């Protein structure tokens, strides 16, 4: 659906990553001595517009600098002009956002979570206790009052509730990388064009002005075929 979400004027974008895995967790993969690139931890990068709730870009990959740049390049293609963008504290965003979006004149900030103890990683079933957040301006002139990732984090919770393969503490997980990718592609297309947002009372696509009606499932499947 990338061709329908391209060069959009936006105001405020929030980015985050969602952890899952394919086949087995990265720790198990390491113990087995496997170098199979199609199994292990799988991170879904998500960019959502604060006001329209439209998912502007997403990317399935590893939590690396390379995949972070691939994600921010997709966000750059989906947008135009200046806007505010807030990410979590993942260090790779600092270079990736400036590299991909700096020429557009974005105002970039990070919301860094402070933990009671050093978190092992977001792959833990019981994350370390978050005791606060620190707003860190990185590039441009971000509005401190708008530095937030609450909307994208709420959306990521909805993703986990909607797709069993992303639900924690279950025996459900993706067995193949391409199956997870296909599921995510359908989810985001359905979310943007078919699913009426409870707050907006229309779909994000209608709110963003890229659709004039609520899509039926059949229409979505034909468009993505």
Which residues are covered by each model-predicted region?
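Residue-level recognition of single "structural anchor" positions
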Residues: 1-225
């Amino acid at each position: 659906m990338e061709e329908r979400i391209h060069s959009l004027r936006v105001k405020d974008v929030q980015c985050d990553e969602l952890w899952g895995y394919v086949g087995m967790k990265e720790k198990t993969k390491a113990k087995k001595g496997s170098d199979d690139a199609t199994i292990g931890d799988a991170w879904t990068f998500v960019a959502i517009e604060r006001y329209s709730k439209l998912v502007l870009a997403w990317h399935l990959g590893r939590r690396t600098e390379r995949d972070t740049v691939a994600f921010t390049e997709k966000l750059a293609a989906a947008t135009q002009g200046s806007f505010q963008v807030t990410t979590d504290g993942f260090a790779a965003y600092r270079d990736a956002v400036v590299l991909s979006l700096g020429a557009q004149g974005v105002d970039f900030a990070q919301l860094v979570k402070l933990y009671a103890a050093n978190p092992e990683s977001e792959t833990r079933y019981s994350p370390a206790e978050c005791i606060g957040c620190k707003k860190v301006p990185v590039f441009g002139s971000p509005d401190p009052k708008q530095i937030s990732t609450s909307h994208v984090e709420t959306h990521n919770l909805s993703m986990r509730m909607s797709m069993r393969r992303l639900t924690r503490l279950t025996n459900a997980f993706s067995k193949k990388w391409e199956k997870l990718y296909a599921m995510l592609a359908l989810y985001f297309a359905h979310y943007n064009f078919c699913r009426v947002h409870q707050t907006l009372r229309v779909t994000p696509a209608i709110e963003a002005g890229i659709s004039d009606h609520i899509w039926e499932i059949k229409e979505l499947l034909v468009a993505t075929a």
